[in-house]
Amino acid sequence: VHLNAPLQPGESKVVKRALVIGGGIAGIQTALDIADAGYEVDIVEKTPSIGGRMSQLDKTFPTLDCSACILTPKMVEASAHERINLFTYSEVEKVSGFVGDFKVDIRKKARSVDMSKCTGCGVCSQKCPSKKTPSEFNRGLGTRSAIYTPFAQAIPNVPVIDREHCIKFQTGKCGLCSKVCAAGAIDYTQEDEIVTREYGAIVVATGFDMIKLDKFGEYSYDTCPDVITS
């Protein structure tokens, strides 16, 4: 085997940009490490904000340190880093190529809010008449508006319209958020956009999801409303 050699030695292009799939604490720290090493990084996060599951925690085990005190400075650092690009409310659509030269299609889902105009004042969420949607951030223990930011420290601090629960998209009526938006950032005509980028490396940091306790009958999770998870 040691005598084997390629018939024609060749070189392959290496794109000096990395893709991190997942904007939780693992993805954020990975992006910061790569960016601090001098390389451009894109973070693709499927929810409207980076932060991931750690943003939902009160304290961390075993030291019981404040979760937000650890996470939010890193969120701010990642968003302000000159070599990190955030693709929030986006998903990887297609990956082709090979190590050193990947081509990736990223679907930027329509927020129905112009990020370049929005000031993050929150008036649209306050005035929205549709407020009965279970909050994903609070694991269904509370409700949110049809136009919302996931949590107070969200980055970017730009709301997204949940079209399935928006009166405007379902009936053609309402439009109150557009009327109260002083910045004129509401855009009901916004559509998904496909962005194609090239990368030399891809890091998958997609995190975890909560176990479905309704599969464990001994806890009566699906029959007793007073049984909740931690």
Indicate residue ranges for each PLM-predicted region.
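N-terminal Rossmann-like FAD-binding beta1-loop-alpha1 element of flavoenzymes
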Residues: 18-42
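Non-heme iron-sulfur electron-transfer modules
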Residues: 6-9, 47-73, 87-117, 129-165, ...
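Glycine-rich Rossmann-fold phosphate-binding loop(s) that bind the pyrophosphate
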Residues: 22-26, 121, 206
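A conserved hydrophobic secondary-structure block that centers on an alpha-helix together
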Residues: 13, 29-32, 189-192
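A short, basic/flexible loop-to-alpha-helix module at the beginning of a structural domain
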Residues: 1-18
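Conserved beta-strand segments of alpha/beta enzyme cores
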Residues: 40, 83-85, 226
